[in-house]
Curated annotation (Swiss-Prot):
GO terms for cellular component: Golgi apparatus; Golgi membrane. Interacts with B4GAT1. Residues 30-721 are lumenal. This is Xylosyl- and glucuronyltransferase LARGE2. The lineage of its organism: Eukaryota, Metazoa, Chordata, Craniata, Vertebrata. Bifunctional glycosyltransferase with both alpha-1,3-xylosyltransferase and beta-1,3-glucuronyltransferase activities involved in the maturation of alpha-dystroglycan (DAG1) by glycosylation leading to DAG1 binding to laminin G-like domain-containing extracellular proteins with high affinity and in a phosphorylated-O-mannosyl trisaccharide dependent manner. Elongates the glucuronyl-beta-1,4-xylose-beta disaccharide primer structure by adding repeating units [-3-Xylose-alpha-1,3-GlcA-beta-1-] to produce a heteropolysaccharide. Supports the maturation of DAG1 more effectively than LARGE1. Residues 59-89 are annotated as: Disordered. It comes from Homo sapiens (Human). Gene3D superfamilies: Spore Coat Polysaccharide Biosynthesis Protein SpsA, Chain A.
Amino acid sequence: MLPRGRPRALGAAALLLLLLLLGFLLFGGDLGCERREPGGRAGAPGCFPGPLMPRVPPDGRLRRAAALDGDPGAGPGDHNRSDCGPQPPPPPKCELLHVAIVCAGHNSSRDVITLVKSMLFYRKNPLHLHLVTDAVARNILETLFHTWMVPAVRVSFYHADQLKPQVSWIPNKHYSGLYGLMKLVLPSALPAELARVIVLDTDVTFASDISELWALFAHFSDTQAIGLVENQSDWYLGNLWKNHRPWPALGRGFNTGVILLRLDRLRQAGWEQMWRLTARRELLSLPATSLADQDIFNAVIKEHPGLVQRLPCVWNVQLSDHTLAERCYSEASDLKVIHWNSPKKLRVKNKHVEFFRNFYLTFLEYDGNLLRRELFVCPSQPPPGAEQLQQALAQLDEEDPCFEFRQQQLTVHRVHVTFLPHEPPPPRPHDVTLVAQLSMDRLQMLEALCRHWPGPMSLALYLTDAEAQQFLHFVEASPVLAARQDVAYHVVYREGPLYPVNQLRNVALAQALTPYVFLSDIDFLPAYSLYDYLRASIEQLGLGSRRKAALVVPAFETLRYRFSFPHSKVELLALLDAGTLYTFRYHEWPRGHAPTDYARWREAQAPYRVQWAANYEPYVVVPRDCPRYDPRFVGFGWNKVAHIVELDAQEYELLVLPEAFTIHLPHAPSLDISRFRSSPTYRDCLQALKDEFHQDLSRHHGAAALKYLPALQQPQSPARG
């Protein structure tokens, strides 16, 4: 006999089993879609919504209450519906995915980096980036990718200037100018053997693995060659304002911020002749394109609708001024690509803009160094120098007391040259660029430096990705800095515990464009007249190929945060006599500048020659092709001294200028100075670097290097600095 209550329990269990079976029969299709979704996530965009599914049909077009108002193409046959049909399989694990981007100028280059970060964060496949760039963007991005050393990423560059004649005949009102038309010529510009490519605008951000987008090529019919998301505004309906006359489009038209191109089919179909004929015909009645290449793509698709494959709306969520994208993202559980296609970019008016802005800022400020780590293994050519670097790192001993120094020397820092818009100075035979380096805690020096030095500057900044954005806002908010287009800022991204001072100097020095450079430090303010005086002195002394010399600019310092900066040598000497100024490091490290002979400088009327002496580290003006700084010296100590030793070994004259001066302003000691003062191990490691430096000096200069041996053997005093 069953215990009381057992029949009731068995009945309940049977009822539950029946309900589960019924649920499986009802929702099995949805579960099947989840299993077939590329990338393995629940929520395939091609499935009808179940309880846990996104409400985005296979083409991304929203129906019923969620449909776009006034949608002229809402018929069931217009949307490429698969009704939960088979989802495209993901591409093979190691298939190379091709991505094309048109990029021109400084600002667009910064946008590309954020886009690439978002792609790299999610990607599981090797990538080949095809970048159509102007000279400015190529210089920036070539340097960046070379120093980034991301595994399984290839980059090819194409000269935008060579493509301009193919589109320059098209009048265009869009802010992107001619570059906004260059996607039209990609089938002929990219290699003939390239059959498929994803084309992206610089203002898109990925929220998913790009291989899922690549997988949508499998949806193409035999005749389709262009994959696009429908335009998420009423622009092509012509009802945004009175007398608005857009280019012809199929229904709402399509947005070209994200494109899948079957290049092979477009070439076979005669794409170049097709878009040219269409554009010429439409321009007979329309004055210009308003949305650049997008207008012409839409006009061609209107005439040849069989070319287009509609993509789900989540692959191009458009945040334009008149966007209706909310109808897409409010129904979707898994957005794929965010597109800031308003000229206002992050300042566009949208009630959900904070959500999208924060998502964008995540990648804008994301540490790009973390993307160097390869989380998947695919056979690919390693970045140049990567194998040698890994071998050198593998030989380091983590138990070595100087391990930090050794590791920092081998670190390859990401470098973003000309981070902000920069206009190179017009060529002048005796022009001088001020070269310096700084970190975030010295930004406050920039405005004063710009007031003191009216000439070109090349400055290297050691920043994190997040600090780089703070720096950008700092410059934009400063009328003094924003007005100076002749100041080139180069961001070297922070990595490692020690300050790579000489690597920073070399970056700034390499980017100087004038024949001569003034090698300074950020804590110094030069005399107001120094720029003009240096150019005149270079000409008078006949420097250049006839005479190899380093012009010494005498250095002074003040311990006061506020003082009246001298406008002449006479005023400076008065402040020196009054005790307001001192010769630089007179109290702590007089050997560093004693050879300048300040007593002689007081009376000098003409340049005079001085001899090198141990620990001499003056600030000098030299030709741009001077020896580079020794990058082994990181942190504090001997970084400038070693450079002056090299100049002397290469027989540079040291000439002190009688009317030149620069003044050091007080500041809190850096972390590296503090470590130098407090740590005997730090000083021992510095001595080891000095010994290695002399060995290399002897190999290069032979017996002539013996004169520097006593200086190199002197121990470093912890009181220095």
